[in-house]
């Protein structure tokens, strides 16, 4: 099994009551298979609720609890961890913190939104795309560049909304400005 290493992508959050949400999405390398076992690459993400940033991710051919444990260990410790109830999350040892294993999507809205942003902005992750990366390293590099830009965008968005004088939700910039 070929794997790509982990990367810590965001600074340690300053507030004490932090929430991290974990989720995974799948995609294909080379082409979309015609068999029933459709998934062959997993992108596992760990997202901070506030600020909305990707604090850890991994791209691999498997989504084992050991791999998720590496993502959890590479990020700063948080107060709460929320997941979507996949059984592999139960086997993960969280760093002495309270663990919430959620059985529905109500506590994972942030990470589901970030995964939707990943599929929106990265053409090779779009569901009905005909684009596929040929190598796992290429997919890793594309996601690495996007995560860096996404975290810069999130920090700029929080700073802008903190300093604004109006109640408008429009931003004078987008995530594409940070690529």
Predicted regions and their residues:
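Residue-level recognition of single "structural anchor" positions
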Residues: 1-179
């Amino acid at each position: 099994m070929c794997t790509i290493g982990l990367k810590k992508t965001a600074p340690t959050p300053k507030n004490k009551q932090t929430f991290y949400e974990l989720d995974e999405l799948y995609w294909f390398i080379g082409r979309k298979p015609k068999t029933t076992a459709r998934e062959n690459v997993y992108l596992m993400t760990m997202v901070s609720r506030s600020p909305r940033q990707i604090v850890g991710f991994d791209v691999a051919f498997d989504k084992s609890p050991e791999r998720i444990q590496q993502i959890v260990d590479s990020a700063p410790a948080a107060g709460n961890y929320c997941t979507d109830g996949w059984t592999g999350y139960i086997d993960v040892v969280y760093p002495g913190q309270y663990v919430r294993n959620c059985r529905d999507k109500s506590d994972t809205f942030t990470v589901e939104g970030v995964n939707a942003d990943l599929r929106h902005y990265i053409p090779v992750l779009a569901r009905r795309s005909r684009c596929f990366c040929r190598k796992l390293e290429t997919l890793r590099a594309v996601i690495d560049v996007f995560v860096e830009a996404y975290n810069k965008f999130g920090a700029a968005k929080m700073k802008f909304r903190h300093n604004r004088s109006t109640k408008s939700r429009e931003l004078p910039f987008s995530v594409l400005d940070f690529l």
